[in-house]
Amino acid sequence: MGLYVSRLFNRLFQKKDVRILMVGLDAAGKTTILYKVKLGEVVTTIPTIGFNVETVEFRNISFTVWDVGGQDKIRPLWRHYYSNTDGLIFVVDSNDRERIDDAREGLHRMINEEELKDAIILVFANKQDLPNAMSAAEVTEKLHLNTIRERNWFIQSTCATRGDGLYEGFDWLTTHLNNAK
């Protein structure tokens, strides 16, 4: 009985450590999202050459978030960050209609990688504050998200500068990572 109570207590209150890989095309808002969630404020960013890594505490999970640069020359290096990834956050600039096909190709290339087969997928349809931004439904269609089978995925409309949708996305991650581990 004591062992059962101890395990239940640990399951309910023990902090979990998870590894999150956050990627997307350049200028999608990845670094802005990372620091808005971490610090609660918008910071001035420059294009990420390489990566940023931060720990974000949310509910009972300690997220180690790897924000990897998205310039086309850097994208082949994304695979070096796949190992032990529990969740993938793919950030899309919803206002960038010209490169949505590039985003789709990058996302589908990643989700077909063996090292990411168990990672859950959260898509942030970012920059929803811009007047010509695609809705989450349109981004879902353009990214062919409905073709993703046997994978747990979710799309969340966001505005990184205002913080809209970010915590809802992390809430989804928390719920599904708790169920998976």
From Swiss-Prot:
<keyword id="KW-0333">Golgi apparatus</keyword>
<keyword id="KW-0653">Protein transport</keyword>
<protein>
    <recommendedName>
        <fullName>ADP-ribosylation factor 1</fullName>
        <ecNumber>3.6.5.2</ecNumber>
    </recommendedName>
</protein>
<dbReference type="InterPro" id="IPR045872">
    <property type="entry name" value="Arf1-5-like"/>
</dbReference>
<comment type="subunit">
    <text>May interact with GTPase RAB5b.</text>
</comment>
<keyword id="KW-0472">Membrane</keyword>
<comment type="function">
    <text>Small GTPase involved in protein trafficking between different compartments. Modulates vesicle budding and uncoating within the Golgi complex. In its GTP-bound form, triggers the recruitment of coatomer proteins to the Golgi membrane. The hydrolysis of ARF1-bound GTP, which is mediated by ARFGAPs proteins, is required for dissociation of coat proteins from Golgi membranes and vesicles. Regulates the transport of N-acylated AK2 to the parasitophorous vacuole membrane. May be involved in the activation of lipid kinase PIP5K.</text>
</comment>
<dbReference type="GO" id="GO:0003924">
    <property type="term" value="F:GTPase activity"/>
</dbReference>
<keyword id="KW-0931">ER-Golgi transport</keyword>
<comment type="similarity">
    <text>Belongs to the small GTPase superfamily. Arf family.</text>
</comment>
<keyword id="KW-0378">Hydrolase</keyword>
<dbReference type="InterPro" id="IPR005225">
    <property type="entry name" value="Small_GTP-bd"/>
</dbReference>
<dbReference type="GO" id="GO:0000139">
    <property type="term" value="C:Golgi membrane"/>
</dbReference>
<keyword id="KW-0547">Nucleotide-binding</keyword>
<keyword id="KW-0449">Lipoprotein</keyword>
<keyword id="KW-0342">GTP-binding</keyword>
<feature type="binding site">
    <location>
        <begin position="126"/>
        <end position="129"/>
    </location>
    <ligand>
        <name>GTP</name>
    </ligand>
</feature>
<dbReference type="GO" id="GO:0005525">
    <property type="term" value="F:GTP binding"/>
</dbReference>
<dbReference type="Pfam" id="PF00025">
    <property type="entry name" value="Arf"/>
</dbReference>
<keyword id="KW-0813">Transport</keyword>
<feature type="lipid moiety-binding region" description="N-myristoyl glycine">
    <location>
        <position position="2"/>
    </location>
</feature>
<feature type="binding site">
    <location>
        <begin position="24"/>
        <end position="31"/>
    </location>
    <ligand>
        <name>GTP</name>
    </ligand>
</feature>
<dbReference type="InterPro" id="IPR024156">
    <property type="entry name" value="Small_GTPase_ARF"/>
</dbReference>
<dbReference type="GO" id="GO:0016192">
    <property type="term" value="P:vesicle-mediated transport"/>
</dbReference>
<dbReference type="InterPro" id="IPR006689">
    <property type="entry name" value="Small_GTPase_ARF/SAR"/>
</dbReference>
<feature type="binding site">
    <location>
        <position position="160"/>
    </location>
    <ligand>
        <name>GTP</name>
    </ligand>
</feature>
<keyword id="KW-0519">Myristate</keyword>
<dbReference type="GO" id="GO:0015031">
    <property type="term" value="P:protein transport"/>
</dbReference>
<dbReference type="InterPro" id="IPR027417">
    <property type="entry name" value="P-loop_NTPase"/>
</dbReference>
